[in-house]
Amino acid sequence: MSDTNDQGNSGGRKPLTVVRKTSGTVKQSFSHGRSKQVVVETKKRRPVSSGGGQGGDSGPSTPSASDGMEAKLVALAAKLGITVAELKARQKVLEQRKAEEASRAKDTEAERAAQDRLRTEQERKQQEAREREEAELRRRAEEEAAKLADVASREAVERPSKAPRAAPAAQTPPAADGEADAGRSKRSSGGGASKPARDDRADRAREVATKPSRGDAERRRGKLTIASALGDDADRQRSLASVRRARERERERRVGGGDSNDKTSIEVTLPETITLQDLAQRMNERVADVVKFMFKQGEMLRGNDIVDADMAELIAGEFGHTVRRVSEADVEIGLEGTDDRDEDLQPRAPIVTIMGHVDHGKTSLLDALRKTDVAGGEAGGITQHIGAYQVQLKSGERITFLDTPGHAAFTAMRARGANATDIAILVVAADDSVKPQTIESISHAKAAGVPIVVAITKSDLHDANPEKVLTDLLQYDIQVEAMGGVTQAVKVSAKTGAGLDELTDAISIQAEILELKANPNRQADGVVIESKLDKGRGPVATVLVKRGTLKRGDIVVAGANWGKVRALVDERGQQLADAGPSLPVEVLGLDGAPDPGDAIVVVDSEARAREITEYRIRTKRQVAGNASVAARASLDQLMNRLKDGAIVTSELPIVLKGDVQGSVEAITMSLDKISTEEVRAKVIHGAVGGISESDVLLARSSNAPIFAFNVRANKQARDLAEREGVEIRYYSIIYDLLDDVKATLSGMLAPEKRETFLGYADILEVFNITKVGKVAGCRISEGKVMRGCGVRLLRDNVVIHEGKLKTLKRFKDEVSEVNAGMECGMAFERYDDIRVGDKIECFQVEEIARTLA
């Protein structure tokens, strides 16, 4: 029932109802100014009183009703666990809140009603404007049609009569406007709506219904709840996405604004390589801007592409930033420590390297100084790795000796010995004079900048000629004191001991001149002389301490290996607590065998040691990878070499195991020297230690023999090698190993072809024989012809074919040889273009085996 009917029945008796319904509208607001009105119906329970009047207002409650209400309040308070006063206070607060909500809803309803009226007025004005525009268009169209009709036919009589009837039609909208105004006036007066007004509302409803709305999807998306309907949407906050978009637009505007807003220049840290995405983050720039800049430079790169430090510095400079370049090698900064002060230095023992040609008596001389017999224990009587010893003289002075090999294969060892030494003793045999390795030792000593003391050995032999030695040394800028120079020369004999005291005195004098000092009270550093894998002890490195004191428990880094020093052992096998400057010791505790020549340094912590070794391992792998890529020829290059007739190198793969790292290195270098362009010995794996099963499996997969130098294979490896057919060769002298490899490489060389001339034959007649082809009837004009020999067909002294002789017959018999002046029949292999008058040249090819020099 409507409010109008309720007001009309106010004079009579109100009907008795249980529930009163009050309806209202709630406006739901959306973004972009859109809104939606929703009808909300609230049901209120009407209190029933004991006595009622006709006016519907209840009278005062009876005492029994009041007692009942009080009893209900007491029961409800007891149920909720609160007092009656608290319950009444809560009810009062709820009633006040309901009153406030009703007041707020009333204000909102009034505001919405005003907005509805304003919107209705705007819609009416827009409708009137559209109708006026349509009427104007219709009028112009009719005028144009009238002009065209008048021009087309002036004789028609019916046209002028039809034209006036078209004018009232154009005046129809004003009538409709009048009806609409009349309908609106009737509605405003509260009376019933007339039929034309209802038709006008229906037309407007259809027009609004057919008009598409932009917010249909948005209005249907949200679900209306009572909380959202009663809530105040006037203070809606912006979403985070909207705020982010606004900030992005503002930043784009600033970037596009040019130089109006200068960007802050920051310092960018650049490693050796960096991705564009990481570079953009460090510059606080967008990745798209960096990629766009590279595109302008002609580089099609993506965000995850890597650029070097130079390119990254160029990019950062273009964006107005400064750079600070860092490198992975920075982890080694400060590794060697600072220089020592003069007041901290103390005298140390000189380090003397004995160098010279093989079999000139270097080790025997050292044995005479040490009163030992090291040479007797050397395989083949030659030294094959560096020996480090410290000798105490009768005067109490100490001298550290390094005994280097004299064989040509140990060039690297001699170079390391010269670099780690203070004084070089050049040993020259009096009966053999200067030899190639003597010259090489002189070059190493001069390159290292160390003084030389010449020791002329074997001077007690009957064919000794020390004067020739001194004269030959003049060719290499070694001028001894006897000839007006500064180099000391001493004649010694290791067998009789003659001249040993003079030699030690010369070393002491030279050490005093050099003023050798070191600081023992600092962290130690030195050089690795030799390394090996010892069964039961693990990796063992022979170390020569240069500065500081190496103690047990120190954390050391040696090349790409690190470890904690577990034990220090001298050359006599005694355990040491520490090792001072110029003292050679064996160090146990490393995680691997370092390369000879690597520096060994004490560091503060295991973390620092791991960081340094990881960097060195990465660097070593990178260098090895670059070398393998450079050495590996692509398929196109190989095909081009074959097409050009170039020689393709044949390789002999070898798995090499040695007792010490220096021996493995020396053998590898010697194998490289005996290799040629045609054949090459390639060490696919060279390591220290015994032969294991993994070595056998590697040799089997590579079809390579295993060369063992002073090491042996365990039982499991021997059994596996026998099953797999892998050859293991054992050597104790480097000469024998190199000779076997040289013989194997010689067998891989292609034989040399040598051609021998046999004779000439003239073609007198050509016969065509079935199943044989063309046969030439010839006369031998010079030399002889042999069956199966090589032939060349000459026509006008031009070679037109080269091949082999297929048949050689005299009359009907097959013969092996035809001499000069005799006639015979010849046929060529897979060639028939022979003519009368051609000449045949016969020759024989011999293959001669080649050997490596």
Curated annotation (Swiss-Prot):
The keyword GTP-binding applies. Transmembrane segments: none annotated. This is Translation initiation factor IF-2. It is found in: Cytoplasm. GO terms for molecular function: GTP binding; GTPase activity; translation initiation factor activity. One of the essential components for the initiation of protein synthesis. Protects formylmethionyl-tRNA from spontaneous hydrolysis and promotes its binding to the 30S ribosomal subunits. Also involved in the hydrolysis of GTP during the formation of the 70S ribosomal complex. Residues 381-385 are annotated as: G2. Residues 20-32 have a biased composition (Polar residues). Residues 403-406 are annotated as: G3. Signal peptide: none annotated. The gene is infB. Residues 356-363 are annotated as: G1. GTP binds at residues 356-363, 403-407, 457-460. Residues 457-460 are annotated as: G4. Belongs to the TRAFAC class translation factor GTPase superfamily. Classic translation factor GTPase family. IF-2 subfamily. The keyword Nucleotide-binding applies.
